[in-house]
Amino acid sequence: MIARTKIICTIGPATNTPEMLEKLLDAGMNVARLNFSHGTHESHGRTIAILKELREKRQVPLAIMLDTKGPEIRLGQVESPIKVKPGDRLTLTSKEILGSKEAGVTLYPSCVFPFVRERAPVLIDDGYIQAVVVNAQEHLIEIEFQNSGEIKSNKSLSIKDIDVALPFMTEKDITDLKFGVEQELDLIAASFVRCNEDIDSMRKVLENFGRPNMPIIAKIENHLGVQNFQEIAKASDGIMIARGDLGIELSIVEVPALQKFMARVSRETGRFCITATQMLESMIRNPLPTRAEVSDVANAIHDGTSAVMLSGETASGTYPIEAVKTMRSIIQETEKSFDYQAFFQLNDKNSALKVSPYLEAIGASGIQIAEKASAKAIIVYTQTGGSPMFLSKYRPYLPIIAVTPNRNVYYRLAVEWGVYPMLTSESNRTVWRHQACVYGVEKGILSNYDKILVFSRGAGMQDTNNLTLTTVNDVLSPSLE
């Protein structure tokens, strides 16, 4: 059974071996996420090499995503996890040290120290550990813990009521982007996006490195990102709803409504949407998810999210393969009750938000024709990815087989809802149609006498303007004679 909603897996110590990565792929991984808040270029380079070798061997459109560290406040390295309980105190310093309970822990960036005030609430590791500032100095602050937990290396930290303007891109981010371009990665996830100018500035950096069209995913993690969301959505290629930091920056009870709002606007503006953070969190330690987690994933799918993301579950968890299999099972079961018609009507109704009226008119008409004719799939030839992306926006029941000669587009489409990318070296319509039908049969999407709708370009045209209703048998029959 196919799964239209895509799965993103964060790669970490639990899964960065060839054997585990292949198991993740078999379980349902569509995108491999590399979190550049952790690791080095050397360690990420090794993982990238394994992923590229794997996707080449298996001939699959596995995308590789670089997730930037961004302008975040984060702890430094600790010698070993520091166990804390209510009333315990810990020193945070601007000095570069290997952290311990006695020596303290480094806090990055150092520019935040002058802005910290006593009695300010502190949240560590997505809010799991809570503390309060009891002493604030120019290069040192002391916090007192309000609950028990473990302080680990590189964990995120949020200080309430702090008014410091951090730069959107750090020197590390720029170095990481250069590395990502050199490694020919497929997607960039930009952390802590606050406005559309942030996206524009990152595009200029990527252009300077020779990759102006590299897709940028805007991670919405703070109140400014929410406030400027519609402009950010238009400026970016996709959206990630980063619920962890969002639930810290804003009230946690606001997150569900914001998730639905952002998923809807992303879809209406033709941008893919990723729902992330704590989706199957308990599976870091347990082989089965909670009922609430299953409902959370299902609700994200019913919201129309393009992809769901696993973080600690696959990066450092005890049951990474089980987590991906569970996610795929939830997707397949939920999509049985997905209201495809309602999503089509909703997207078709919001004509004011259409980015390309021409493409969308062709796409919407084609979907209606295909469904009325009881077709089993849509086949579309694309050089830029535009046509399948606009088709995906309407959330059709029919799988979209996207045929492309562009390797960058092939991998980039891996994150799009309901799109099954196929790489070809052919531009001849007869040949690529034949290849697409063979691919569809091999993947279990099509059978011999199924009807299909083919989108293609007319002679001299740059955009899709031809719709052909045919059958798999008619396309394949020349080779059977």
Curated annotation (Swiss-Prot):
This is Pyruvate kinase. It catalyses: pyruvate + ATP = phosphoenolpyruvate + ADP + H(+). The lineage of its organism: Bacteria, Pseudomonadati, Chlamydiota, Chlamydiia, Chlamydiales. Its cofactor is Mg(2+); K(+). The keyword Kinase applies. Homotetramer. PANTHER family: PYRUVATE KINASE. ATP binds at residues 35-38, 74, 155. Pathway: Carbohydrate degradation; glycolysis; pyruvate from D-glyceraldehyde 3-phosphate: step 5/5.
